[in-house]
Amino acid sequence: MFFFLKRIYQSSKSLQVKQCATALPEVVEENILYLVAGKQSCSSVEVPAKGVFWILGDPIGALSSPENLIKANGDIDLHTLYTELAGHYNWFWVGRDRLATGSSFGGILPVYYHHEINCVCISSSSDFLADRINAPANDRRYILERLLFHYPLFDATWYQEIKLLPAHSQLSITATHFSVRKNLDFSAYSGTPSKSHNRDLNQLAEQFVSACSDFMPVNRFGISLTGGFDGRTLVGVALKNNRSFFTYSFGASSSSDIQVPARQAKKLGLSHHSIILDENYLRNDADRSIQDFMSLSDYHGNVGRPHYLYSASILSQETSFIVTGNFGSELFRALHLPGMMMTKHLIDVFSSSDRQWKDRLWTEVKSWGQNDFDAELEGLIDDINKYLDESGMTGNARFYRFVYEELFRKYFGPEIIMQNHFLNNRTPYLNYSFVHSLNQTIWSGVHRPLFEENKFKRMIGQLFYAQVLRMSDHRLYRMKTSKGYAPNDVGESWRKPVLFYRYIQQKFNQNEALDDNNVFSVIEHFMQESKLNGIPDSGITFKGLNRDTLINWLSIAYGITKRNANHYASTTY
């Protein structure tokens, strides 16, 4: 899917909408909003005497009363929109006197924009937009944020002239100006942990089962089944609803994410696809998958995830839809360890009580950047301060505001954007109505202590998975996960000794491969082929970096080398 518009202020030409099946026309005109559906869908609904509401993407649900979306001031009521339409999509309101646009809950699918004195441009691709306006890839602040946090924190892109629309916001264009305004605050769905009884857990599980079934297509689809809780819970719901589906997983042949799902799918009588990431993949597909993944994500992704593209290309030969457990674990358990999803610097920003994180950021940046990023770091610290203070929240609630508004879209977004070129990834856990209900309970990660590390306290969210499986499929409810214990060990209080024993046994007997997806081998070969050993033209080297930092810095370096390459030639989406 793809969209583009160049809107000229005070133009005598009215705004038009043009639907395209797979590609833009050879001549792209001003004042026309081009909507390219690609593997997704494009639909519209008319609001009499007011305008037309367009949806581009893969929405789940239907608008019962579209006129209720439009507030008296012309803004879109995002609470109503997100309640009625789940899924990943971009929306466009073409009214009599304005165009407004934004994204679905979580802002996973981006809206990029560029503003000049006499016009504003919007697009789903920052690279395409940069090509149209001849924008140089010159945003050093973007580079700095990725060096520190693995992804940009706020609205920065590779290009100073192009910004990313914030999540849960609306960009409006009238005849004379444009504006960006946030329409839904975290406080609207952050909730308070007022529900804690078994009946509340049962009600939450029933709500999820009902909502989850809406995400599951009528035709055959795939479900990501791993050794953990997220995927098997989705399998349980699909079995309960007698859906036509197959399961799949990817990894090295010896990994638990291959062996456990394949073995358990067989017991359940399910067709299972094992996508093996061994020598054949490394030799024939990994490098190309890196290049394509990075290009299709506008180089906002990272080079350590080529297996997502490889698996999407294979699965697209079987189905147009997959249902995955993306976002699941993060909703229920308190995030706490540095890694690919969050760096030690991000943890420091949200956990430091004395604001000494600022000094530590300065020390870190000067250790590899000398004084080259002084101006950018000063501005970044000011913006972080403002972000921390403006919510009025503290602790884990303040951090989870960042998770919902920034982390989800920056970490999972490039993956889902890339997958859209092959198929549709439906993610039932990121559902506004469900999240709103979850955050009223003690099982939400929002209400856990900040960066809680106690393993057994962090298991509280697994009670939800256990309850869903208890009411969905008793076989899955009793099957062990790759963690060594089964959902019923968590869901039945009398089995706590069994849970403790199995957890300890797994911890001491675990012989799991350290590199399930052969990322080490992929990165080593890619570095040799690309001849990258540092950030170009900066003096910053990759020497002594841990794996996660190396992957992300290598991704930045690779993106820099590709900024002037001709990767805008294709307009097929």
Label each residue range with its predicted role.
Residues 406-407:
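Short beta-strand elements
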Residues 1-225, 229-280, 289:
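Cysteine-centered catalytic environments shared across enzyme families
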Residues 6-8, 481-484:
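Generic extreme N-terminal start-of-chain segments
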Residues 68-70, 74, 84-88, 483-485, ...:
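Long amphipathic alpha-helical segments
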